[in-house]
């Protein structure tokens, strides 16, 4: 987590009201990782998102799956296309199984990010897997 975000870590029950009632340190860390990804810092996003996914207070399956979609994008954009496609395929399967339409939309955007490598073996395998899941 970045130095600026470190002061957000001590969240107590008084802070959990209204719009941010379901936010905890882990969810904030996922948000930071997503921002790093979108700011073109995939290596930093990989570290941040992996850390978030390993924390004990990762109590929301939806947040974990969103983190895994963004982690897959970060792997792919950092040159680890095979790992990115593997993580995205596994996550897409989980999202489809639970009927998480917002998560599937997020995964579709991740697939769009890897379009420049559409003829590479890992991407072709991912696309075949997605087609079979959607069939």
Where are these regions (language model features)?
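Conserved binding/catalytic microenvironments
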Residues: 1-135
